[in-house]
UniProtKB/Swiss-Prot annotation:
This protein is involved in the repair of mismatches in DNA. It is possible that it carries out the mismatch recognition step. This protein has a weak ATPase activity. PANTHER family: DNA MISMATCH REPAIR PROTEIN MSH1, MITOCHONDRIAL (PTHR11361:SF34), DNA MISMATCH REPAIR PROTEIN MUTS FAMILY MEMBER (PTHR11361). NCBIfam families: mutS1 (TIGR01070), PRK05399.1 (NF003810). This is DNA mismatch repair protein MutS. InterPro entries: DNA_mismatch_repair_MutS (IPR005748), DNA_mismatch_repair_MutS-lik_N (IPR007695), DNA_mismatch_repair_MutS/MSH (IPR017261), DNA_mismatch_repair_MutS_C (IPR000432), DNA_mismatch_repair_MutS_clamp (IPR007861), DNA_mismatch_repair_MutS_core (IPR007696), DNA_mismatch_repair_MutS_N (IPR016151), DNA_mismatch_repair_MutS_sf (IPR036187). It comes from Aquifex aeolicus (strain VF5). The keyword Nucleotide-binding applies. Pfam families: MutS_I, MutS_II, MutS_III, MutS_IV, MutS_V.
């Protein structure tokens, strides 16, 4: 039971005052060299951080309260763990020197750290959502790298946008229901705010940026100010005096990028594998960047590839020049190596959180930036000329830091020893006093002996009196009038002078004064640097682009990748293409060719499981994606058309967490593709229809192929285990059959991973099962059943016509007609104009027909 305020110690009363202001936060309460957690917060801290739980008296009586703590100098690592687990953390700091405090030390909550605002340890961002009609207006703020964007998307596009922006926290109006998949798929922290917060934020952002409307920044509607204002106000409210420099907001533009939704990002394993492993992702395998900003630029380009041939080719020219000019590439990499993350430094410096060492890192990195600029002057590719125009002169910052700070300053600003000699005359004097106190005293003693003629005069010190002048009794008659008596002893008297008192004060307080003065000089330096940070930000962006290009050049050189020809036409040709990720981990990778053109733009790929169907179709998608960021690709030669979108249907992914069946998810994903793909899109479909019965799967797959052929003309790769789909070649425009070659051996089968024209001869499922290690008796039983089925199947040349003739007058024939009626109905569905709800109703009707047929037959 909590004590009343009167019974608590003054410190705990102060704690309760702040805890009541921030009840939804863990309150880190500064006590000396530790941040302490009390009460329930202590239990949470002990559990989540593995801290030892202790206790202290609550006040009068014997009651004790639980507590645990972390050292203040290493608090960030503990805070990171708490924030990553979804907690908000309020920092209650001592705001006065405890040695000078009268009574309880003054404290204030100086900052609230949330998942979207912990910019020291993460580059994740903060998003605010404002729903209006069928659209969401999105405000996005990344404090770590100074990115402030506004977007407007349809409800169904929201997940794709937020997944690209790397959101850690979402702000919504209290009581507003979010799309269910946002929290579950993105796994983000949601903070609910009163509607007034959005309105106040809207007013605040306009006022602070000095505009009447955000249309001044390119936003077409005033509604953008609500979500943008909310993230802006939230950042300032939580970060208080530590708020980094927030740039003016920019509209998020996606018109110039290839459409890449969250399904394609997952399906092509761009950032992580289907199993969730980041170490075998496309990004990880091709990343040769050397700076934090370059790494983020590469990731951004992979998620937002260019849709402009001109932009792609400009990047390609830069990559080619560096690939061929090995000396220049090595010099660039040497310059970039060890360069600080300038974007992150801008945020830390502007938030008053940068250490002296980080300012030195900034200075050294800006020197490297100048080296890089001079090197780029020697290169010929137009892209480097463009980048050069973005560099800004930062010599003023470099010189200022160099003249002010020592080369290897301490980690913490208040430790002293960070300002160079000659910067401040008084500081130099204090240091001399500190380092030469004894010399100062002996010189003053000598001076006094000369002035008074008292040769036995001496200066001494004790803790009670401090410094004093001692004169023996025989010499008291020579003591000058400016000597002030302090103490009388039996054989001598002790005096002081104004000059000795000044000297004493200087000596005893020199180190404290040194530290305080150095801190003030450091703050002045930091303020001067802050005024120049826009230049640093522009240079950071230029460096990021160079790092991105050199990374592509480095891997192209390492792997001997080829430059794809980019064109505005239709055909997609890849000769001896290889999957860059699989090739990294598999020896003797087998390359394959691809040719999608007007005559064959739907490739149906068959073959047994493990033969390489899925890897091949993803390979084509990955190589197309790489081509659109300006990268060279693992192929002998390639001709890649500019595409407007990359669609994939691969695996069921995270939707299982939403309670959606595999089959329903397949249909929703395919529906999205059929409703949005165009002739300029590339579509990757892997095993569509596997989540339902064989007949359903075949019927739906055929209907999809027909729709793509007749309505979309999109270049499509369809991997399937339904051999019946191969019947469409020659019947439907654009369909061409391919299969993954398999070699039969006495021991079973051997996968060759070679793509060949024509359909697969059988599925080899039992052989694959044997390779997987199924018990021999299971394999033999499966072979026996398969032979029986094949004997029945061999009696039919074409399943549908022969069944019609054989069972025309039988009950089985009637059932076949009913199934054909169902198939016909499926083929007649206009998927492009069918909503998910309509699809469910149609499925329900078809299921009812199937159930009726079974009852009629007595099945």
């Amino acid at each position: 039971m909590e004590k009343s305020e009167k019974e608590l110690t003054p410190m705990l009363s102060q704690y309760h005052y702040f805890k009541n202001q921030y009840p939804d936060c863990l309150l880190l309460f500064r006590l000396g060299d530790f941040y302490e957690l009390f009460y329930e917060d202590a239990y949470i801290g002990s559990k989540e951080l593995g801290l030892v739980l202790t206790s202290r008296p609550a006040g009068k009586g014997k009651e004790r309260i639980p507590m645990c703590g972390v050292p203040y100098h290493s608090a960030n690592s503990y805070i990171a763990k708490l924030v990553n687990k979804g907690y908000k953390v309020a920092i209650c700091e001592q705001v006065e020197d405890p040695s000078k405090a009268k009574g309880i030390v003054k404290r204030e909550v100086v900052r609230v750290i949330t998942p979207g605002t912990f910019f020291e340890r993460d580059t994740g961002g903060l998003a605010s959502l404002y729903k209006k009609g069928n659209h969401y207006y999105v405000g996005y703020l990344n404090l770590a790298v100074g990115e402030f964007l506004g977007a407007k998307v349809k409800i169904e596009e929201l997940l794709d946008l937020l997944s690209k922006l790397n959101i850690k926290e979402i702000l919504v109006k209290k009581g507003e229901k979010l799309p269910e998949e946002l929290e579950k798929v993105l796994k983000v922290y949601v903070s609910e705010l009163e509607e007034e917060f959005f309105e106040e934020g809207s007013e605040e952002i306009l006022k602070d940026f000095g505009v009447l409307s955000l249309q001044a920044f390119g936003f077409e509607e005033d509604t953008y100010s609500l979500p943008l204002g909310a993230v802006y106000k939230y950042a300032k409210t939580t970060q208080k005096g530590y708020t980094p420099l927030i740039p003016r907001p920019k509209p998020y533009r996606d018109e110039g990028f290839v459409r890449l939704d969250i399904k394609a990002i997952k399906g092509l394993e761009i950032l992580e594998s289907l199993e969730g492993r980041k170490d075998i992702s496309l990004f990880k395998v091709i990343d040769r960047t050397l700076t934090g900003m370059g790494r983020r630029r590469l990731k951004f380009r992979l998620l937002s590839p260019f849709r402009s041939r001109e932009k792609i080719e400009r990047i390609q020219e830069g990559v080619q020049e560096l690939k061929e000019n090995r000396e220049a590439l090595l010099k660039i990499r040497q310059i970039l190596e060890g360069m600080a993350d300038l974007e992150r430094l801008v945020s830390k410096i502007s938030s008053n959180m940068a250490t002296p060492r980080e300012l030195v890192y900034l200075k050294n990195s800006l020197k490297k930036v100048e080296e890089l600029r001079l090197l780029l002057l020697e290169l010929k590719a137009p892209i480097f000329k463009e980048i050069l125009q973005n560099f800004e002169d930062t010599k003023k910052i470099i010189n200022d830091i160099e003249k002010t700070l020592v080369e290897d300053p301490p980690l913490h600003v208040k430790e002293g020893g960070l300002i160079r000699e000659g910067v401040n005359a008084y500081l130099d004097e204090l240091r001399f006093i500190r380092d030469n106190a004894e010399t100062y005293l002996r010189e003053y003693e000598k001076k006094l002996r000369q002035e008074t003629g008292i040769q036995s005069l001496k200066i001494g010190y004790n803790k009670v009196m401090g410094y004093y002048i001692e004169v023996t009794k025989p010499n008291l008659k020579y003591v000058p009038s400016y000597f002030r008596r302090r103490q009388t002893l039996s054989n001598s008297e002790r005096f002081t002078t104004e000059e000795l008192q000044r000297l004493e004060e200087k000596i005893l307080s020199a180190q404290t004064r040194i530290n305080d003065l150095e801190y003030e000089l450091y703050k002045e330096l930091r303020e001067r640097v802050v005024k120049e940070l826009d230049k640093v930000g522009n240079n950071a962006s230029a460096v990021a682009e160079v790092d991105f290009i050199q990374s592509l050049a480095q891997i192209a050189y390492e792997k001997d990748w080829a430059k794809p020809q980019i064109h505005e036409g239709y055909e997609l040709i890849i000769e001896e293409g290889r999957h860059p990720v699989i090739e990294e981990f598999v020896e003797n990778y087998v390359p394959n060719d691809t040719k999608l053109d007007r005559d064959s733009f739907i490739h149906v790929i068959t073959g047994p499981n493990m033969a390489g169907k899925s890897s091949y179709i993803r390979q084509v998608g990955v190589l197309t994606l790489l081509s659109h960021i300006g990268s060279f690709i693992p192929a002998r030669r390639a001709k890649i058309p500019v595409v407007d979108a990359l669609f994939t249907r691969i695996g069921s992914g995270d939707v299982l967490a939403l309670g959606v069946s595999t089959f329903m998810n397949e249909m929703l994903e395919v529906s999205n593709i059929l409703n949005n793909a165009t002739e300029k899109s590339l579509v990757i479909l892997d095993e569509v229809g596997r989540g339902t019965s064989t007949y359903d799967g075949i019927a739906i797959s055929k209907a999809i192929v027909k729709y793509i052929s007749e309505k979309l003309k999109a270049k499509t790769l369809l991997a399937t285990h339904f051999l019946e789909i191969t019947e469409l070649e020659g019947k439907i425009e654009g369909v061409k059959n391919y299969h993954m070659e398999v070699e039969k051996t006495p021991e079973g089968i051997r996968f060759l991973y070679i793509l060949k024209e024509g359909k697969a001869e059988g599925s080899f499922g039992i052989e694959v099962a044997k390779l997987a290690g199924l018990p021999e008796e299971v394999v033999e039983e499966a072979r026996k059943i398969l032979r029986e089925l094949e004997e029945k199947e061999n009696k039919k040349e074409d399943i549908v016509p022969l069944l019609e003739e054989t069972f025309k007058k039988s009950e089985e024939a009637q059932r076949l007609e009913e199934y054909e009626e169902i198939i016909k109905k499926i083929e007649e569905i206009d998927i492009g104009n069918t909503t998910p709800l309509q699809a469910l109703l149609i499925l329900a009707e078809l299921k009812k027909k199937c159930s009726f047929s079974k009852k009629e037959s007595g099945a």
